Amino acid sequence: MFVVLFVLTLILLYAVFVVWAERKVAAFIQDRLGPMEVGPYGMLQTIADLIKLLQKEDIIATGANRFLFRLAPVLIFTAIFAGFATLPFAPDLIGSKADVGVFFMITIVSLDVVGIFLAGWASNNKFSILGAFRAIAQVISYEIPLTLSILAVVLICQTLDLQEISFQQGIYFVNKQELNTSLFGITSLGIDVNKIGGFVSWNAFKYPFLLLAYVVFFIASLAECNRAPFDIPEGESELVSGFHTEYTGFRFAILFLAEYAMMLLVAFLGVVLFFGSWNTALPNIGSLHFADWTSGTPGTIAGYAWGLFWLISKGITVVFLQLVMRWTYPRLRVDQLMNLCWKILLPLSLFLVIVSGVWVVWMKI
């Protein structure tokens, strides 16, 4: 119950902050100030907008399927919220420890597209249903390279448990499976990355080809979130607002919150798989035990605090990169989007899976 309340509070506070941050990022890139009037530096603008949004009239179109129209936003948010259940927030802080956490996460990330289709179809609006069709085609296409990029990590780590993957990238890893913990998997170097800790022990640095896997993961996750430059399902110039054209008031707020929650979820997932999860970024250097000093002991208050700090810091950094991407790159056409997926990302992700398999076999020789 504590984790449920913690995640819900985290999502709400994050949404308030990131909506303001997105406006400021957009303003900076477009050489303007952004919100400045409500609160210091406009920091309370999101609260004001939320109050205004909740006062809006709840309108349901005459021809809409009222039951499914109401159900869709709840289904979308619930699917995304459930994804946080198996995320490790600290060494001993996880909603539900699952041995197949990676599989659960891949499944749950895909479920929100069902709600998107219901939202588009139940609205009985041509723009909404076209947006829903685009979202389905996009998500199904990008699900494949996304899953393959994750599979590359799973092959290396030899587990589907997200908490175990987290431990493998830090100083508290107990090597029960006799995994190769040498830098680049080369035992002759004599460098045990788990003793050094910090960024040196992260998957993306321990196995350099996984940096390329993360690039595939990041691009595919943007498409999963329907974020620019992959926001074709919501193309304002073509579809008004896509699948949520007919939504107003509180239900629109739920859809808006779900989109930002999805951004945070895939950011956290990428951090857990590639960038050390809740482990510190600072390595031990000689007598300077930065990793030890900035990790805390698992099961203690310091362990929880440091774990949350590092995971949230890394996650927010990725979200910031997502925001910059939106205001930097133009929206792709549908054919460009599909070409990128099927002709570039899919072959690249397949190649990375093969490299991971060969790497694992080579490390055991």
Swiss-Prot record:
Enzyme Commission number(s) of this protein: 7.1.1.-
Membrane topology reported for the UniProt record: Multi-pass membrane protein
Keyword NAD belongs to the record: yes
One Pfam family recorded for the sequence: NADHdh
Intracellular or extracellular location(s): Cell inner membrane
Catalysed reactions, semicolon-separated: a quinone + NADH + 5 H(+)(in) = a quinol + NAD(+) + 4 H(+)(out)
TM stretches of this protein: 1-21, 71-91, 100-120, 136-156, 199-219, 254-274, 301-321, 342-362
GO biological process: aerobic respiration
GO cellular component: plasma membrane
Keywords on record: Cell inner membrane, Cell membrane, Membrane, NAD, Quinone, Translocase, Transmembrane, Transmembrane helix, Ubiquinone
GO molecular function: NADH dehydrogenase activity; oxidoreductase activity, acting on NAD(P)H, quinone or similar compound as acceptor; quinone binding
Domain of life, per lineage: Bacteria
Subunit record text: NDH-1 is composed of 14 different subunits. Subunits NuoA, H, J, K, L, M, N constitute the membrane sector of the complex.
Known function: NDH-1 shuttles electrons from NADH, via FMN and iron-sulfur (Fe-S) centers, to quinones in the respiratory chain. The immediate electron acceptor for the enzyme in this species is believed to be ubiquinone. Couples the redox reaction to proton translocation (for every two electrons transferred, four hydrogen ions are translocated across the cytoplasmic membrane), and thus conserves the redox energy in a proton gradient. This subunit may bind ubiquinone.
HAMAP family per the UniProt record, alphabetical: NDH1_NuoH
Family: Belongs to the complex I subunit 1 family.
Name the UniProt record assigns to this protein: NADH-quinone oxidoreductase subunit H 2
Species: Cytophaga hutchinsonii (strain ATCC 33406 / DSM 1761 / CIP 103989 / NBRC 15051 / NCIMB 9469 / D465)
Gene that this polypeptide is encoded by: nuoH2
